[in-house]
Amino acid sequence: MTIVSEIELERIRKLMREAGLGEIKNGINPVTGGLMHKMYRVETAEGIFAVKHLNPEIMKRPSAKDNFARAESLEKILEENKLPIVPAMTIKGMKMQAIDGHYYYIYHWLEGQITDWNTISEKQCYLAGQILGRMHAIDAQNVQKEKPSFMPVDFSSFLDLAGDLKPELKEMLSHHLDELSSVQTSILTAGRELPSMRVISDGDMDPKNVMWQGTTPFVIDLECLDYANPMRSMLELGIQWAGAVTYDFSKEKLLAFFKGYLEKYDNGYRSYEDLYGFVYQNWIEWLEYNLGRAAGKEVSSEEEKQLGESESEKTLKLIHYLSEIEPQVREMLANDLSPVCAQNFDTHDQRLCFFEIMFEGSLEHIPDYPLPEGYRIRAVTVDEAPEKVKQDWIEIEKSAREFETYGQGEEAWNRYYGSRTEMLPGRMFFVEDATGQRVATATAFFDIYGRDQSGAGWLHWVAVRREEQGKGLSKPMIAAVLKRLKELGHFQVKIPTQTTTWLACKVYYDMGFRPIPKNLVSSRAGWKMLEQLAGIRVL
């Protein structure tokens, strides 16, 4: 039985009074609150509440309050989107409450059950996957590629802490050093393969933090809410729900988790097998933290030191188990996930995971494609006002969803053509309808960054206004631009595009263009997406 100090009891009494929740009745009872913080069941005249005392040692960290504040703001977003969560109460405009230098969260008490890790059902995995999918769908964005932040840990250094680790733990750690080195290499590999996306996610949404009222789940303990990569977050949590933590991995449970997730959020990515290294990362970091606790770092009691020892031993065993099941899980991820459904996506869809795609091909034989009646193709002429050309170009690209705002279009125009407007006559083409309105565009150009020294011409910024799509305008326009590139002396063409414009990729493929070999390697996951979205089979 956990004994609560009188000082702690008095702080909680004071907390409830200052929060306006009344005097305590029926005592303050400790309940399971995880490994990091302490939790109490508190009953007052106003109701029953859960009170969480945040770990004082953690709160001393310079970044702690900022991290909690960020989680609180994201928790509010989940509340607004009506996700099934148990949020911290907002009292006097604040979620976190400070009492005598200690920090607390107060929650309405929820009667329910935490499912034992050993008895989780496939249905529960499916429902948990749905919640995570709903969470990720709220604010999913493609973002700039970031350098992986993981720094390998030299676990052998803990063996040098003479007398600080108990002998049994030292021996166990020594036995697993090679394995720890190997899995950290896998983490680094996964970091290089990880596409750059950002979503709201809860990295701690494992079974211990989902409470069930019958068959209805509620996510609790949301302090780990943050922006994260959806593919990594999904894989890490799915593996846990599938039984890996209890050394009883179930392929069926992992597939159920994926099924629920992909029903609520799908960015088209299907190369999760490349990311298995991330399954280890949180456990590597958890092991480092607990070895530190076991060695007496950042602990305030012998009890916490012993907890660090036991958690270190558990984590070493778990990392070993995860390495044993890795081949089985990789095979399942590569072959058994539901395929991407093209009908769920627009022709230009920013919800899709972004990969740069590069086609190339010969300009020796350019096919002819008839332009539908009532349309004509015209190149920009020298007597046209550059501002009008820019305006028409941006409006077409914006209609095709290349940009969300006119300002984004101006930024792209300035980057590609702003200092080169004198080159656009005879290179930039438009399709005009019967009224003379410009409805599609493409440009015969080159690599503006000067990296491509092959002498190939580049096909730039192909776009058709949304209301004109599906009328057969793109292929005749592309053919006209390719012929112009040939007239300019080019024998090859390169076509930069991306997975978010997957239907355009199909057009290029159908016209006979094929991936640049280097891009087929660097964007292999993107080409796998195109295989499922557009039937482009190059892998």
Question: What are the residue ranges of the model-derived segments?
Answer:
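A cross-family kinase active-site recognition segment
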Residues: 118-173, 198
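Active-site activation/catalytic loop segments of kinase-like enzymes and analogous catalytic loops
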Residues: 231-266, 280-299
